[in-house]
């Protein structure tokens, strides 16, 4: 399992975990991980901050789910929403484009409950590393 956003991930095993996937989206959706509309719009309108959003998302969504079942169900999938990710020079996610994204809350929740690290999908991971190629 990995996470990403619709703009950069175009593979076949993407799963939308947002309320509004792209209009042309024909891939899978996983509504159980979508933020409640009221919570989504409160954050979008700056009525709540990131900390309050995370608390409520955990209370209203994640607390009702079994992390083991979620992981087993979505194993091998890429969880998709809209926010772009920002990486440090080592390839670690610093935050999303506006500093916040619920897919990273899900990643953290899976780590806290199962010890599983769910990384942000990196297109460079898909490049085959052929060690037999000559350098010259």
Roles of regions detected by a PLM:
Residues 1-136:
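Residues lining hydrophobic/aromatic ligand-binding pockets adjacent to catalytic sites
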């Amino acid at each position: 399992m990995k996470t990403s956003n619709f703009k950069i991930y175009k593979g076949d095993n993407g799963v939308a975990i947002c309320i509004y996937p792209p209009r042309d989206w024909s891939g899978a959706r996983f509504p159980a991980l979508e933020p409640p509309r009221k919570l989504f719009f409160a954050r979008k309108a700056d009525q709540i901050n990131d900390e309050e959003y995370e608390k409520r998302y955990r209370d209203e969504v994640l607390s009702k789910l079994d992390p083991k079942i979620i992981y087993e169900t979505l194993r091998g999938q890429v969880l998709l929403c809209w926010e772009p990710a920002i990486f440090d020079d080592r390839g670690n996610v610093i935050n999303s484009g506006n500093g916040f994204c619920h897919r990273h809350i899900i990643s953290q929740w899976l780590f806290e409950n199962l010890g599983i690290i769910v990384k942000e999908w990196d297109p460079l991971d898909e490049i085959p590393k052929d060690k037999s190629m000559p350098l010259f």
